């Protein structure tokens, strides 16, 4: 199958999801946009040495049966998408990708292969199909979200924590584990709270200098840190939301960005930058490329078409 | 109340639970055995400067109404214990302290104030009383068990882990968090598994170079790593049981000691050293002394007698 | 003596050189600009509680006999400076402070007390006087320049180094030591080169993925990494100049800034951000305030006038 | 040439200097003692799969033209050595290997190829020949001496350093750099002193909680820490001599061992364990094997005979 890889144009995105060294025994033809490897100083020649075709962005879209885009396809590329094309990547069909599904996927009968960690499925003509992609394939990406987000937040806040800095981490999933690993380089004065021990956090939350959130709560769940609780935090407390669950777990919080990563409200500081794995894109690209090559690019991607075949006659 | 502090004689125990700098406004008289601070280079004079009485071991036992012993009182001291004396410390009444309870506590009507993290209670004449001591008072000690145990195990095994070393941590409680924090100094190639994700561990456990256990399972629970599963681990895999739950979570494993910390079985290596917080006694003593001074030694300890008063008429 | 402390207006400067908790037994009157502690969430009230006078910027300049300014006084404040006033801080009289000396210090007969690490002297009417300030008083600031600069550079470059990343550090002084300490959190694949071993670096420099410079060479010294040597570095090599010795040690390199910290040239990346200690201002302020309180603010600063008294009749 | 590799019998030595994965295109025949890879769980079969001959210890000595022994050949093996045999390894001809040179090398006309970092030479019949081995080939071993020695010393002393722990490192060579990298995982409150700044150390040495020595001074040099200076150190100060320069740099200090690593003298603690790289033998073996394969085992070792040929007619 012809798979097209285009340069990321998602704001702040610098990860390169396929590296020449991992291109081995691919049962797919790979079309790569000129300068695809630029962020990692990889020349086009290195991709063509591995049998890839180097084309312009438009040509890649035009000649590919499937487009791999790590992040959501941006509106500026909508006009490239052709009827029946396959899209592989994080598409967040029930989240930030809803408008893409409505405006592009449905009308153009796109075959959307979503790499969501918990339910990697195929979305086609309002139906959901099992994809055969292992669950948690890219779990480490969430780990990196916590890992890189904490480091960036600390530097932007201007503090290297020490054993004197009291640190709470909410959640014990991959994002929280990445945050825990990252901040452990500097301090072991950390306590990780999860469902069973959250009551202890509620009794002690005002003691913390840094509170790191790694939890995405459900729409109807109560926030873990309400407005009033935030008010009783110490002056100067730093809240790092590496789950980027803006406004939910930390009531009233809003997104920040890589260029303006921290805002202050009533003497507390909030870091709610999304897409933080891209901060350490040189590490993450290595891992992504290895996993995607083994699980997506190596085997013929027409296998995903067969999954939706009956509808796709 | 007269509280006696004697030098630790529990094998390998070097923590000093009370430091002169924390002795302020104590509503108790403190009797300290000569050389009590020796492990931390604290002279007897520094204790007497703070109003403590420096006595021989026998005199401390003889003149104290309550004996503080961080670890279980050892048989060699049984003969010192007098009728109705109070014992404060970790006494493990349902675990390793059962024989102490049977042979000493009951017959001598001792008032046993147990500092157990989850249920800090008073045991007196076969009855259990609420102690008023906050739960999780010494939670950080479990954290240190994981923290120090992992570091010691790595050095004994001869490996500083890198990003190439695949590491699994079982559990997300304090012991597991200490282990996670400790090994994060060297690698972020870590995944922490807990109840909800243990099935993923079961599918992947053979990939790991190091498996760290931070879980104490119940008597009737299945082991998390059975004999057969251990057989299919990679040659040279290191299993660090910082919960020191010998024979349970890791089927068939047995205790090791600080002097002989690792044994090999079928090409796998096992570290099951108990009491690992004592490895970094210089850090832990600081924390213990502060917490115990605030929560145990400052207020009059006769408060514990009042808790059991009706029976103690 | 009346000492005035005004908010930093040096680009990117966020350190607060005096904290209320360190104000004890000062033989000087302290005048503080409103909002002086803002970066560290310290209210004006906390300074007035310690006997400081809270004034507007203009009033501080107007009423102070000495102005403490950590960084060079900026042109926008020149008009505030009065004849015979004392300036205490880093004034770089032979470096970036030359124009200040010429335009302000000399004509207004300012008494300039320079806190330079190697030669902390007083400059007054073209004469240089010994200050009595201990050498190396603020050596740790250079350490932090290396420490924070490396961390920021890595995040901007998008890489957390591992044991696979080959790292060279040039120099063994305080800046180089800070860089060494910082990057050691992530990798031990480091070699520090100094005068005696620089020849070994010259034989091996093309093997390195990251080259960190902690050396300020003399005006007439050869660069340590010439244009041609830079050309033969690996594609993607990151050069972090935490000595910010732009154009000297690394031939042809130029300053970058906190907002645009890295530039690429022929596939190599250059980070040459000056004033990096300010990146971790929350840590550095604590240390600065303690040292400055003990060595500058506590004793009567008129002692510096006496040093230049004969001329100042 | 036939090269024999025997199991280490140097006290505490666990490094395995050749791993099967590095055996490629060797121009030498390799004879390996049974169980040679045991410490790293490498079976004899893995060596024979790579063309090695698996023999008893005696057979290896009997059939090899050259014996590779990382550490000094022990007296228990002297009787194996045959006239004219080659010995490759660290032989310390002017240090601990003097008796070996006198009792074995000279009388049996052994060709001793010493892997000393600064002067890798061949010693044959009282003559010294250039070996062609690059200088600093195994420099990283000294780095590991500092790295592992510091970690072991801290654990034996019972302290994980924090930012409150004042740490001095003497020297800026490879051993000192390893120590610096190791302790930087836990604290950045470190200052490295070398020739130019040693005077500053002499003015401040009593402030330090931990003093790490990475310097081997010359026989006639004054100690860096004299008896009297040691007396004025703080009670409980830990002195870690990872240069293991017992009795010289730290006046009066004596060797300790892995089993009894620390002694106390007048309230100060001394760690002077030699051969500390072997503590982390699993890391160091990987590095040693790669470097030795490339620089020693790959090319025909008879090249060393040719270096001494005229004498060896």
UniProtKB/Swiss-Prot annotation, chains A, B, C, D:
It holds the Pfam family AlaDh_PNT_N. Is potently inhibited by the reaction product N(5)-(L-1-carboxyethyl)-L-ornithine. Pyruvate binds at residues 15, 71, 92. NADP(+) binds at residues 171-176. Keywords: NADP, Oxidoreductase. Homotetramer. Catalyzes the NADPH-dependent reductive condensation between pyruvic acid and the side chain amino group of L-ornithine to form N(5)-(L-1-carboxyethyl)-L-ornithine. To a lesser extent, can also use L-lysine as substrate (yielding N(6)-(L-1-carboxyethyl)-L-lysine). NADH cannot replace NADPH in the condensation reaction. This is N(5)-(carboxyethyl)ornithine synthase. It comes from Lactococcus lactis subsp. lactis. The gene is ceo.
């Amino acid at each position: 199958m012809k798979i097209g890889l285009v340069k990321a144009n998602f704001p702040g995105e610098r990860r390169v999801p396929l590296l020449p060294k991992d291109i081995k025994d691919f049962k797919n033809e790979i079309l790569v946009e000129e300068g695809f490897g630029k962020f990692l100083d990889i020349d086009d020649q290195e991709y063509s040495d591995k049998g890839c075709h180097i084309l312009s962005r438009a040509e890649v879209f035009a000649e590919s049966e499937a487009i791999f885009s790590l992040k959501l396809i941006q509106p500026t590329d909508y006009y490239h998408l052709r009827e029946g094309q396959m899209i592989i990547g994080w598409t967040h069909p029930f989240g930030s990708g809803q408008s893409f599904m409505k405006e592009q996927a449905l009308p153009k009968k796109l075959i959307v292969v979503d790499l969501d960690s918990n339910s990697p499925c195929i979305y086609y003509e309002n139906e959901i199909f099992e994809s055969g992609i292992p669950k948690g394939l890219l779990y480490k990406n969430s780990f990196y979200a916590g890992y890189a987000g904490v480091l960036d937040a600390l530097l932007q806040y201007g503090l290297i924590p020490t054993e004197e800095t009291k640190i709470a981490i909410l959640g014990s999933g991959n994002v929280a584990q990445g945050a825990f690993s990252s901040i452990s380089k500097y301090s072991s004065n950390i306590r990780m709270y999860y469902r069973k021990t959250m009551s202890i956090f509620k009794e002690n939350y005002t003691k913390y200098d840094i509170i790191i959130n790694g939890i995405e709560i459900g729409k109807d769940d109560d926030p873990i840190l309400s407005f009033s609780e935030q008010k009783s935090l110490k002056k100067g407390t730093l809240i790092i939301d590496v789950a980027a669950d803006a406004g939910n777990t930390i009531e009233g919080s809003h997104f920040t960005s890589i260029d303006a990563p921290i805002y202050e409200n009533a003497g507390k500081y909030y870091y709610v930058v999304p897409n933080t794995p891209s901060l350490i894109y040189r590490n993450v690209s290595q891992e992504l490329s290895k996993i995607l090559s083994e699980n997506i690019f190596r085997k013929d991607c027409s296998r995903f078409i067969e999954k939706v075949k009956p509808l796709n006659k």
